[in-house]
Amino acid sequence: MTIHAAVIQKLLNTGAHLGRRAAEHHFKQYAYGTRNGMTIIDSDKTLICLRSAAHFVANLAHMRGNIFFVNTNPLFDEIIELTSRRIQGDSYNHNRAMNLWKMGGFLTNSYSPKKFRSRHKKLCFGPTTMPDCVVVFDSERKSSVILEASKLQIPVVAIVDPNVPLEFFEKITYPVPARDSVKFVYLFCNVITKCFVAEQMKLGIKEGSNEDLMKDLAA
């Protein structure tokens, strides 16, 4: 089995190719076909888009940029928290990274979060400094964040489902077409982490080796 075939098989094992509904017209470029009213996503297209997103993340690490993760699905909390800890290290803030996004102004209000937190202690009102990239999970529900990031010209990396509306899809800089299963989100976060941390090691920002990184991610 070739490396490409092995990677595609790994994607198939995550269920990334199983779209939940019929695809919107703009998504059909990523669709292999349909079955029982559900879109079958082309795994080759998913892999191409995942590589593009990973390359961007590596360049971001080289420029010493920062990433902010946006998630509302509790099934992904543990995965994304672990990813955030590995990428952000000592600067990781559990409350900022893991709390739910429930109202507008996530990015545009990022410079004045304190006046809200006294009344809404369980909410997350965004980073205290502008991120260089926003990674969005459950992009259909996080359309307001995508619009804000686009307005502020912040690149967006997002896992996209076949029914994401065109107005939001067009504003995602690096769309990764896939079903957001727990297995795929874990794979996606692993790829992001490997690329970002490996580049940090090259720059001497993080100590360790690629071998250490691989062992850590496999644990």
Swiss-Prot record:
Pfam families: Ribosomal_S2
Keywords for this protein: Mitochondrion, Ribonucleoprotein, Ribosomal protein
Keyword Cytoplasm applies: no
Molecular-function GO terms, alphabetical: structural constituent of ribosome
Keyword rRNA-binding: no
Subcellular location per the Swiss-Prot or TrEMBL entry: Mitochondrion
GO biological process: translation
GO cellular component, one term: mitochondrial small ribosomal subunit
Entry-linked SUPFAM superfamilies: Ribosomal protein S2
PROSITE patterns, sorted: RIBOSOMAL_S2_1
PANTHER family referenced in this protein's UniProt entry, alphabetically: 30S RIBOSOMAL PROTEIN S2 PROKARYOTIC AND ORGANELLAR, SMALL RIBOSOMAL SUBUNIT PROTEIN US2M
Family the entry assigns: Belongs to the universal ribosomal protein uS2 family.
Subunit structure: Component of the mitochondrial ribosome small subunit.
Protein name: Small ribosomal subunit protein uS2m
UniProt organism field: Arabidopsis thaliana
Lineage summary: Eukaryota, Viridiplantae, Streptophyta, Embryophyta, Tracheophyta
